[in-house]
Amino acid sequence: MQEVKKKKRKFWIIFGSVFLSLVVCFLTIGQIGAFSTAKTLHFWRPNYAKVDIAPLLEKTELTEDDYQLLYRQTGVTKLGIDDMREDEAGKKRILEIQNCLFADYSTYKDCFGLFTYTEELGKKGAEQYSKLARLRTGDVLVSTSMLVSWWRLGHSALVIDGDAGHILEAVQAGWVSEISSVTTFNTRANFILLRPKVDVEMKMQVADYAKKNLVGLRYDLTVGVLSKKYKKEQKKSHCGHIVWRAYKEFGIDIDSNGGGIVTPEDMYYSEYMEVVQVFGLDLNLDKLW
């Protein structure tokens, strides 16, 4: 009997030691990954001169060279420029966007979870803000600024009310998906504003569905791997999945590679997406991600 007890005690001691070693190993590797990835800051400022673009905005018609210059000066594509330069308020916004692109921002990393960081503008408690192009309901925002250990996962959100600046997003473990202000992207070190190539009526339906059915979902990054990617009654989601799920309800698959986990990067490369604006990422590159 004593021999059996000794064997059991020995087993649990060995098991506990191995388990503790694995936990320490996991935490160490995870933290090393977080420190390593945190050094690769994704924030870019133009390495060329700022020029006066106001005269261009007054032209009746713009050439391709004009649009290219405006893109390099603002990060806004033809799609976004044409959407804003129709009125004086839009022209003013374009000039404000240019000022933000060339502004001398400071940046910091905010740790908000286990091995999880975001890259932000300004300082903790004294954030700085960039300027977004005119939002349209159904737009998608993506950013490379969110890191999980070795993985630059990024973040994304669905614009559910362009005029009000309201977005639907799933932020982190322990939280549920919620409607928030788009200003959460204004403080990120970078973002890309995408516009799905579907008609306005469809995008309004997508936004309405999202508001009624995708708010309050528990955050779970394993959706699509440990559980089905598409469920009629969705209970769990994450930042990329929740945007994908809203469009998928109407037969539009914005996941470019069809994998289990839908990432912001997958949506950036979707054939359905057009770029409206880029901030904080190198405008000299054809592929921003």
Model regions and ranges:
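Short N-terminal edge-element motif at the start of the domain
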Residues: 106-150
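Short amphipathic alpha-helical segments, especially helix-boundary/capping motifs
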Residues: 115, 131-132, 182-185, 216-221
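Short, intrinsically disordered/low-complexity patches at protein termini
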Residues: 191-193, 201, 277-279
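Short, solvent-exposed coil/turn linker segments
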Residues: 63, 77-80, 131, 175-184, ...
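Active-site nucleophile-His-acid catalytic modules used for acyl/amide transfer and hydrolysis
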Residues: 194-257
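Activation targets extended, charge/polar-rich intrinsically disordered C-terminal tails
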Residues: 2-18, 23-114, 233-289
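Glycine-rich catalytic cores of cysteine/serine-nucleophile enzymes that process amide/ester linkages
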Residues: 135-197, 224-231
